[in-house]
C-alpha cells in the first residue's frame, strides 16, 4: 500500500514539477517531504505529516528548513542501553 501511495508523488516530481517554476518555500520541497514522510512513517502517519506540511505552505509562512521528523524509538529499547 505504501509503494502504491508513492507512485503519484513520483509522477508529480518527475513529470509535472519540472514544467513548473520553483514555488516551494521549504527545503526539502513539499513533494520530497511527502515522499520521505510516507516512506519512513507509513501511509497513515506520513500522510498526516504531509497534510500538515501542505497546510503550512502559504505566502504568509517564511518557509525554510523543515525536515521530516525522525522515526520515534521505543522507550524500552532506549532504556535497555
UniProtKB/Swiss-Prot annotation:
The keyword Acetylation does not apply. Residues 61-81 are annotated as: Disordered. The keyword Membrane applies. InterPro entries: Membr_insert_effic_factor_YidD (IPR002696). Keywords: Cell inner membrane, Cell membrane, Membrane. GO terms for cellular component: plasma membrane. SMART domains: Haemolytic (SM01234). It is a peripheral membrane protein. It is found in: Cell inner membrane. Disulfide bonds: none annotated. Belongs to the UPF0161 family. Could be involved in insertion of integral membrane proteins into the membrane. This is Putative membrane protein insertion efficiency factor. It comes from Pseudomonas fluorescens (strain Pf0-1).
Amino acid at each position: 500500500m505504501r509503494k502504491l501511495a508513492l507512485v503519484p508523488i513520483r509522477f508529480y516530481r518527475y513529470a509535472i514539477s519540472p514544467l513548473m517554476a520553483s514555488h516551494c518555500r521549504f527545503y526539502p520541497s513539499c513533494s520530497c517531504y511527502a515522499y520521505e514522510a510516507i516512506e519512513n512513517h507509513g501511509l497513515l502517519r506520513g500522510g498526516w505529516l504531509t497534510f500538515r506540511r501542505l497546510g503550512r505552505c502559504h505566502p504568509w509562512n517564511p518557509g525554510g528548513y523543515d525536515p521530516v521528523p525522525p522515526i520515534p524509538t521505543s522507550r524500552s529499547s532506549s532504556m535497555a542501553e
